[in-house]
């Protein structure tokens, strides 16, 4: 562009922000790890509060820790607690993870008999934590906890399965009722013909219809007596018939289309002939 003051600015003048050129550029600004951890922590705290019926802050579980139910009460822990003199290094046990209060299987790595404490390594996670010997639980505690969780999960899945079956069963019972209600005539237009059960296909020369042939046209006096006059507004167009799962075959669709063409031409020809006969009757009356 020209050098006048009213010209457009150069492309570099329109840049609002360019990453990596400023002195205050900080790559940590683009790291959302802390945000993700905060969100996961908030969700875990909310779920933990719902399970226990109270509000308590739940921090991160051991690495890869699945969801486990916390111990119901302290009496359950005391019933499964073994005396401290029975524990030795390498024994399998169950310990309560201090971060979430849930029971996990662990192995005793070291024991301090003077302080009556030990260091346990959580099986499958590798986390190490110091525990009191009196707080250790027998391995059967974890088995009972897993069985209880499995039973609760099975009950929840059964409830959700029953609800989905009920919701899917209710609409399946309606097509027969819909068809029976749609049978009576709602206007002066005749009901659609029955769907043919067979039609064109490989090795077939034509259509074979199982339904009876269309009835002959009614006489004019019957038509004028029983059919109401045409409305003054636009003609009423019936809605298309519902698509049934058993009529989604190509041959059935083709047969339905040919039937509709035939019925349309049939009624159109009858109406045109009826109007022609009326017109000829008026001419003969004047002559």
Curated annotation (Swiss-Prot):
Residues 64-77 have a biased composition (Basic residues). It is found in: Nucleus, Gem; Nucleus, Cajal body; Cytoplasm; Cytoplasmic granule. GO terms for molecular function: RNA binding. Residues 273-287 are annotated as: Required for interaction with SYNCRIP. Residues 149-160 have a biased composition (Low complexity). Residues 92-204 are annotated as: Required for interaction with RPP20/POP7. One of its GO terms (cellular component) is Z disc. There is a cross-link at residues 47, 204 (Glycyl lysine isopeptide (Lys-Gly) (interchain with G-Cter in SUMO2)). Residues 1-28, 51-86, 149-221 are annotated as: Disordered. Homooligomer; may form higher order homooligomers in the dimer to octamer range. Part of the core SMN complex that contains SMN1, GEMIN2/SIP1, DDX20/GEMIN3, GEMIN4, GEMIN5, GEMIN6, GEMIN7, GEMIN8 and STRAP/UNRIP. Part of the SMN-Sm complex that contains SMN1, GEMIN2/SIP1, DDX20/GEMIN3, GEMIN4, GEMIN5, GEMIN6, GEMIN7, GEMIN8, STRAP/UNRIP and the Sm proteins SNRPB, SNRPD1, SNRPD2, SNRPD3, SNRPE, SNRPF and SNRPG. Component of an import snRNP complex composed of KPNB1, RNUT1, SMN1 and ZNF259. The SMN complex catalyzes the assembly of small nuclear ribonucleoproteins (snRNPs), the building blocks of the spliceosome, and thereby plays an important role in the splicing of cellular pre-mRNAs. Most spliceosomal snRNPs contain a common set of Sm proteins SNRPB, SNRPD1, SNRPD2, SNRPD3, SNRPE, SNRPF and SNRPG that assemble in a heptameric protein ring on the Sm site of the small nuclear RNA to form the core snRNP (Sm core). This is Survival motor neuron protein. It comes from Bos taurus (Bovine). The gene is SMN1.
